[in-house]
Amino acid sequence: GFTHAASGHMAMELFKLEGSKCGPKDKDCKGLFMVGIPYRGGGPMMQDLLGGQIPLMFINQDTALPHVKAGKLRALAVSSLQRNALYPDVPTIHESGIPNFQALSWSGMSVAKGTPQPIVDKLEAAFRKVMTSPQTKQWLETKGFVVPEPGGAPYAKFVASEIDLWTKVIKTAGIKPE
């Protein structure tokens, strides 16, 4: 098998699970077997990748870009369903043969349950204003990020889908808290 690295290793676990699915026509399919290496963050992981101690990793596109441009790393695929503007010639994992694979790096703003609705509304309006401003969108897009539809309802739906996905990955991979 291969060794791989990821700070949280969840994207790689999803990759291993999805890449190991063999269809009925795949008589020679052996599955995908990899050994995870726990890291305490992307910095040490990147050093080991650049130093040749590990052969591959999942990392955010903005972190990898300077190393790709310098010729020190080769981007093999992006983990979104659409190609990334920073890497227009790099296929998606979906295009590379693992259907519907998607592992996104994302951030959002959340408040505690029970926060008074007027406060939620005020925060959401301010967040929407910032996220829809041309300056913010342009800055995020130059870093390779996709700006989603802002608002509590789309965000809650997205978070619920992420919880569902990663819960399945955790259970299927047999991941236990340490």
Language-model region placement:
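Conserved, function-defining micro-sites of small-solute handling proteins
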Residues: G1-E178
